[in-house]
């Protein structure tokens, strides 16, 4: 088995790590960063940018720069109304009801897994550059509170990126692996994970290489983006008061506000106030307008207090579900960049009655844990066992629209559970099995993961047929369901794929698109390198012509000048093979100058060469004499 990389596919940033000599190592990207912005952009020429280069052009290209796409993974269009308001790009309803992004620069509607695949490809290439070998397998992390559709969408993204996703791991669990890799004694830890777009809390029992999740809870609509949004709303309101101009419909201004809000939030973690200066934010009949405000930490904490408080209830539920009291927890580990906010650290202390542990890097812990899980799968990380749980209950709809649960939330996975049901009407020959996920009593109030029909049931009075429904959750938290008529032995099975998810055909098409993008990227890089070589050669040849042009024949000089002109003309076009050919022609022609330079250098210093030769002979003789003297 080859190397399995660990990837933290984050809302704001992503990170990749690998096990080396039994220890996890975070890999730097080509820009030198240990994390990579989870941002994908398309330029007006249709070129795809990923990571920092995409982030650098966000302000000037807001409608074609996609960030926080994780908030849309595995979600139906009607589920993302609040998320749509937070982004400048266009989110539409896909043919199968899922949320898709319309990218005007390439005139294409793209699915969230397809966009996330671009970030995963960047992570894959980062690892390949470091290892010097091809990478095909990965462990990818997801928020613990991701439902089945969101997990499936993440696996699909990996497949599109050319990765065989060996395991989907919950982010808090991965962070606990990073924390506990060298811990030998038993302890109970809480992982409080507040990232860019999601919040998770998990309670784990660690000891003797076993990492057992006792409970998990969270909110997939809460993260650092929401904190930024509060600052943006404040700035829009204040600016409207002062200048009577509403910035809320100006996409370029909103993008600048987003950057400024994120920067101010980060500054306020270490300072009591942050200055926000955005010159030329807009203009009216009187000329340009500048935005300038000072935001204090106290004001910021007041603005975001309702968000901070929203993390409290999931924590209390997780503690209760684990059958524990807050005082039973030995350590509280903070994960995710947003846990640097002082108000968050304060509420953590309030909930758990202790100072949180800050010994784990909140930006890297999840990727490190994913790499460790990869090591467990390859056998490189020995004597370690990970026991995770399903975050939400699973069941089916039964008579009266009730949800009958087969697997309760916080059940250790993998797991399998079966229950026998019967028909609801006389002579019923088929049953529609509707698979649900959630905690509400009524089926309509929970998420429908999928449905299938078991037919061919012999006609009989209601209540007579025996239909066994089995739920099987694998180690990735992905659900498989089967229904079997006990009388005939007839069985129907499905692996749950969200009704708004991607079909196999779509995934295959996206895999091919991703591969063609890789080829395009390769050609683009080859073209840039060829142009750089050509420009460098033109510069050097022109410089040499100025110095030595008088010393070569007019015929040679004219030939070189013609070749320079031809190469400059070729640089204007896009034919790379012609460019390489013209570069080679100029290289050959310019050898005439090199010959003249060499002859000139030799002719100018014969005396110096003779002096050096004589000095060389004398020193050799002297060396001989010293050695000879020693022998006496």
Curated annotation (Swiss-Prot):
Residues recorded with modification Phosphothreonine: 198
Pfam families (alphabetical): HSP70
Keyword Nucleotide-binding (UniProt): yes
Keyword Nucleotide-binding in annotation: yes
Gene Ontology molecular function: ATP binding; ATP-dependent protein folding chaperone; unfolded protein binding
Keyword terms of this UniProt record: ATP-binding, Chaperone, Nucleotide-binding, Phosphoprotein, Stress response
Domain of life: Bacteria
Biased composition (Low complexity): 601-617
InterPro entries documented for this protein: ATPase_NBD (IPR043129), Chaperone_DnaK (IPR012725), Heat_shock_70_CS (IPR018181), HSP70_C_sf (IPR029048), HSP70_peptide-bd_sf (IPR029047), Hsp_70_fam (IPR013126)
Induction field: By stress conditions e.g. heat shock.
Region (Disordered): 601-632
Gene3D superfamilies: 1.20.1270.10, 3.30.420.40, Actin, Chain A, domain 4 (3.90.640.10), Substrate Binding Domain Of DNAk, Chain A, domain 1 (2.60.34.10)
Bias-annotated ranges (Basic and acidic residues): 618-632
NCBIfam families: PRK00290.1, PRK05183.1, prok_dnaK
PANTHER family linked: HEAT SHOCK PROTEIN 70KDA
Protein role: Acts as a chaperone.
Family according to the record: Belongs to the heat shock protein 70 family.
Name of the molecule in the record: Chaperone protein DnaK
UniProt lineage: Bacteria, Pseudomonadati, Spirochaetota, Spirochaetia, Spirochaetales
Gene: dnaK
């Amino acid at each position: 088995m080859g190397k399995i990389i660990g990837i933290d596919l984050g809302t704001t940033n992503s990170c990749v790590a690998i096990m080396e000599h039994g220890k996890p190592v975070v890999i730097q990207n080509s820009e030198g960063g240990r994390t990579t912005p989870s941002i994908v952009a398309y330029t007006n020429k249709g070129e795809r940018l990923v990571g920092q280069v995409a982030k650098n052009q966000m302000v000037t290209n807001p409608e074609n720069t996609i960030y926080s796409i994780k908030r849309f993974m595995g979600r139906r269009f009607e589920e993302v109304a609040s998320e749509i308001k937070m982004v400048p790009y266009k989110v539409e309803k896909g043919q199968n009801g899922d949320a898709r992004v319309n990218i005007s620069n390439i005139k294409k509607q793209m699915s969230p897994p397809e966009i996330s695949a671009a970030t995963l490809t960047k992570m894959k290439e980062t690892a390949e550059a470091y290892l010097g070998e091809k990478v095909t397998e990965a462990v990818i992390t997801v928020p613990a509170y991701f439902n089945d559709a969101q997990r499936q969408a993440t696996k699909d993204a990996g497949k599109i990126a050319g990765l065989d996703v060996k395991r989907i791991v919950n982010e808090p669990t991965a962070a606990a692996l990073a924390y506990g890799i060298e811990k030998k004694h038993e302890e109970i830890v809480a992982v409080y994970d507040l990232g860019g777009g999601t919040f998770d809390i998990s309670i784990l029992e660690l000891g003797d290489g076993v990492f057992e999740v006792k409970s998990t809870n969270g909110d997939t609509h809460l993260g650092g983006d929401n904190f930024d949004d509060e600052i943006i709303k404040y700035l829009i309101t204040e600016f409207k008061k002062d200048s009577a101009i509403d910035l809320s419909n100006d996409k370029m201004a909103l993008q600048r506000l987003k950057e400024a809000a994120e920067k101010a939030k980060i500054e306020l973690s270490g300072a009591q106030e942050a200055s926000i200066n955005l010159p030329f934010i807009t203009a009216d009949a009187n000329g340009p307008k500048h935005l300038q405000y000072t935001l204090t930490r106290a004001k910021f904490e007041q603005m975001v207090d309702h968000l901070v408080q929203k993390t409290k209830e999931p924590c209390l539920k997780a503690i209760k579900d684990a059958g524990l009291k807050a005082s039973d927890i030995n350590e509280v580990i903070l994960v995710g960049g947003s846990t640097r906010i002082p108000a968050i650290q304060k509420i953590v202390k309030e909930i758990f009655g202790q100072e949180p542990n800050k010994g784990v890097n909140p930006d890297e812990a999840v990727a490190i844990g994913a790499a460790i899980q990869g090591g467990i799968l390859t056998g490189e990380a020995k004597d370690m066992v990970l026991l995770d749980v399903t975050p939400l209950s699973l069941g089916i709809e039964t008579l009266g629209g009730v949800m009958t649960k087969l697997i309760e939330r916080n059940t250790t996975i993998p797991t399998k559970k079966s229950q026998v049901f019967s028909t609801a009407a006389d002579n019923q020959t088929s049953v529609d099995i509707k698979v649900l996920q959630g905690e509400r009593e009524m089926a309509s109030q929970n998420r429908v993961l999928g449905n299938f029909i078991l037919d061919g049931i012999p006609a009989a009075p209601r209540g007579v047929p025996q239909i066994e429904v089995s739920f099987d959750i694998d180690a990735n938290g992905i659900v498989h369901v089967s229904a079997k008529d006990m009388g005939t032995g007839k069985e129907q099975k499905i692996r749950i794929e969200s009704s708004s998810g991607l079909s196999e055909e779509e995934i295959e098409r996206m895999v091919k698109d991703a591969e063609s993008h890789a080829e395009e990227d390769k050609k683009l890089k080859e073209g840039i390198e060829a142009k750089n070589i050509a420009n460098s050669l033109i510069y050097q040849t022109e410089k040499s012509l100025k110095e030595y042009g008088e010393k070569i024949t007019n015929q040679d000089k004219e030939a070189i000048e013609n070749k320079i002109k031809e190469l400059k003309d070729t640089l204007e076009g896009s034919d790379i093979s012609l460019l390489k050919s013209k570069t080679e022609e100029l290289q050959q022609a310019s050898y005439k100058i090199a010959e003249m330079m060499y002859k000139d250098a030799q002719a100018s210093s014969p005396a110096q060469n003779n002096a050096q030769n004589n000095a060389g002979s004398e020193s050799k003789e002297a060396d001989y004499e010293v050695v000879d003297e020693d022998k006496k």
